Regions:
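Sec-dependent N-terminal signal peptides of Gram-positive bacterial secreted proteins and lipoproteins
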Residues: 2-30
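Penicillin-recognizing serine hydrolase domain
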Residues: 120-124, 226, 230-389
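Boundary regions of SH3-family modules and the immediately adjacent low-complexity/disordered segments
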Residues: 33-37, 97-117
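Residue-level detector of high-confidence beta-strand sites
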Residues: 67, 106, 137-140
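Hydrophobic beta-strand positions
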Residues: 56, 129-130, 352
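Active-site-adjacent loops and short helices of periplasmic peptidoglycan-processing enzymes
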Residues: 117-279
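Beta-loop motif signature
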Residues: 30-95, 99
Length: 389
């Protein structure tokens, strides 16, 4: 009986091995095999993707190098063409490479269309490049759609602070009331704070202005708003009134700092029914333009990399400034404001002036690569003749 069972086990194992071998042979027989019929050089020609379909392979087509959908705004330069045979069919393929030559290989010509790729930003959900001189957009992406803007909101707050200071040196030295238990608690919060408010200590308008601009301190921004208008609620009403006076139809504020009400309620500073400030990229750019026009000192103040304020280091997270990772001398960036909350994502308002060009203001909202995409956006803006000084 045992020997019979063993016999059947051996037969079953042989069947499985035979079946497995058959499957293996079948896969090998049906595997894609491309052979080269002819190859010729061609004049270097620019192409870009026709749609999201298609991929770049090695010439034997047994290794994928890149999918076109992951390179939505790339220009591919073709230098060779070949006729490749696959089974009974033949097709014309181009040997292409991106500008840097870091990605190259063969692709069926039908996946491409002649000409350089139109400019675009891959990550920013909303963006704009504005000519500061004319106030006209030179490039935009969903720029009229309002969305949360995090600490970029402080540009409006700082405008109203500078409006009240009105160049008066003595006003800068006025002491701001920072005794609120909510603001003191916020200043100690690792996620919502920034510049520490010490109980029984006094801070001037200038100190809180630097903390709000450079360190993006939320408690400093709220305290300044209360100093300007008398209360947090009145200041937010003033923010909205200012937006209305500028005809910003896609701007609505509920926060002086840019924090959402879902965070502010823990400190007693929630206001209104909406959760967040909702502003379009275009309206953010217009706020920045008004700020620079009326109070150009914001460029000098905003270009400071770091500053010790009342014994605390205020670090400017604008990494496009001189000496920082994303600095480019040709772009000459001298401002303006970063922002982040999980809801708003990474946001950045940049500005600079290239030699012989008008000043540019750029806005990218909810952009995980806010600095590299701002670099690209500024370069694109300067490529338009309308930006010439």
């Amino acid at each position: 009986m045992k020997s019979g069972k063993a016999k059947w086990l051996v037969l079953a194992l042989m069947f499985v091995l035979t079946l497995g071998a058959g499957l293996s042979l079948q896969v090998t027989a049906d595997a894609a095999v491309y052979s080269t019929v002819s190859t010729a050089t061609m004049t270097k020609t620019a192409y870009h993707k026709k749609s999201t379909a298609g991929a770049i392979y090695n010439q034997a087509h047994n290794r994928k190098i890149a999918s076109l959908k992951t390179y939505p705004n790339t220009t591919w330069y073709a230098t060779q063409k070949a006729t490749l045979k696959h089974g009974n069919s033949k097709g014309i393929y181009y040997y292409v490479a991106n500008k840097s030559g870091s990605v190259k290989g063969w692709i069926w010509h039908g996946y491409l269309t002649k000409g350089k790729a139109p400019f675009g930003l891959k990550y920013a959900k909303n963006a704009i490049a504005m000519d500061y001189t004319t106030g006209k957009a030179v490039w935009s992406k969903s720029a009229n759609t309002a969305r949360p803007i995090a600490s970029v909101s402080k540009l409006m707050t700082l405008y109203l602070v500078l409006q009240k200071v009105d160049g008066n040196a003595s006003t800068w030295n006025q002491v701001v009331d920072t005794s609120s238990k909510g603001l003191i608690a916020m200043s100690k919060s690792s996620s919502c704070g920034g510049f520490l408010f010490q109980t029984g200590h006094s801070y001037t308008v200038r100190e809180l202005y630097d903390a709000a601009l450079l360190d993006s301190s939320n408690n400093a921004a709220i305290a300044l708003g209360e100093w300007v208008a008398g209360s947090n609620a009145k200041f937010i009403q003033q923010m909205n009134a200012q937006a209305k006076s500028w005809n910003l139809g896609k701007a609505s504020f509920v926060s002086a700092s840019g924090l959402e009400n879902s965070d502010l309620k823990a400190f007693g500073y929630a206001y209104g029914t909406a959760n967040a400030n909702m502003v379009s990229a275009k309206d953010v750019a217009l706020i920045a333009r008004h700020l620079i026009q009326d109070y150009p000192q914001i460029l000098t103040d905003g270009a400071v990399g770091s500053k010790t304020v009342d014994g605390q280091l205020c670090y400017n997270y604008n990494n496009m400034l001189s000496g920082r990772k994303y600095y480019k001398a040709s772009l000459n960036v001298d401002g303006l404001k970063t922002g982040y909350t999980p809801l708003a994502g990474y946001c950045f308002v940049g500005t600079g002036q290239q030699a012989g060009k008008h000043r540019v203001i750029t806005v990218v909202l909810h952009d995980i690569n806010e600095f590299t995409e701002t670099q690209s956006l500024m370069k694109q803006a300067y490529s338009y003749s309308s930006m010439n000084a």
